[in-house]
Amino acid sequence: MMKTTIMFMLVVVISLTYSSEEQEVARTYCGAHLANTLADLCFGVEKRSGAQYAPYFWTRQYLGSRGKRGVVDECCFQPCTLDVLLSYCG
């Protein structure tokens, strides 16, 4: 199990390194395609504990428009990059 996880993470890192050398293409992700892509990208990404979150009053001040929008707004209604999708992991 651990070996599989390490291999998967290695493939992800190599893929991200390779893709960062080229200009990333923005695409639309909707419905099951969005859910499956997020599941594939976020596999193995641990959720942050509550202690790592900033207090509510602080986060609302700095979230800006990102705090009011969701992954569907950013990646289904308009094209987004894999980096944007990765920002929703964890």
Curated annotation (Swiss-Prot):
GO CC annotations, alphabetized: extracellular space
Proregion residues excised on maturation: 49-67
Signal peptide interval: 1-20
CDD domains: IlGF_insulin_bombyxin_like
Stretches that traverse the bilayer: none
Superkingdom field: Eukaryota
Residue ranges that the Swiss-Prot or TrEMBL entry lists as coiled coil: none
Compartments it resides in: Secreted
Gene Ontology terms for molecular function: growth factor activity; hormone activity
Major location (coarse): secreted
Keyword tags: Cleavage on pair of basic residues, Disulfide bond, Hormone, Secreted, Signal
Cysteine pairs bridged by disulfides in the record: C30-C76, C42-C89, C75-C80
Subunit structure: Heterodimer of a B chain and an A chain linked by two disulfide bonds.
Family to which the UniProt record says this protein belongs: Belongs to the insulin family.
Note: Silk worm has two kinds of PTTH: 4K-PTTH and 22K-PTTH; there are many forms of 4K-PTTH.
Role: Brain peptide responsible for activation of prothoracic glands to produce ecdysone in insects.
Protein name: Bombyxin B-12
Organism: Bombyx mori
Gene: BBXB12
